[in-house]
């Protein structure tokens, strides 16, 4: 009987999944925050309680290694610079810059999101209620990144959005709007792999440019450009 109990306890111990949770609430002129989480089911904010930074300048770098991790972050500030690195599957990112507040313009934004893995859900919003004067966003899915959903919304005067993904069965929802400046908006989209669903909306009174390169079978692409 003792042997049976010992085996059951060992199985329970080896199947436990530990998770780390981080909740950030920050206000002030400047924040430089680096977060690294290694493991499964870790969170930086969640669907009900987002982490938040309200200040003039935010530098935010997050590395998550593992599966089923969550990032939910709201930034209210004039300048945002950040890099998010994901290695693993079934991760969820919801990042908003211009979440409200007296310094919420998100006037200058430079964001990079790198992911390696499958079934990830990435939602990036910059300039939700006030246009970003300058936005430079890079989203990169490394080789073998399959069945991911990437949604990027940028409202600004001069937005440059570059998306490069190597994998199959990915879905892209891209919306770039705002009046634009003399340079207009630029979207550079490169996809390698089969079964890509791409929806692009680009609007602004000045010149807009889309460079789209796709390599693979069964791509469904819809593009709408308006002044």
Indicate residue ranges for each PLM-predicted region.
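Bacterial Sec-dependent N-terminal signal peptides
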Residues: 1-9
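Sec/Tat signal peptide C-region and signal peptidase I cleavage site
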Residues: 5, 13-19
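Intrinsic disorder/low-complexity segments, especially N-terminal tails and targeting/processing regions
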Residues: 9-13, 162
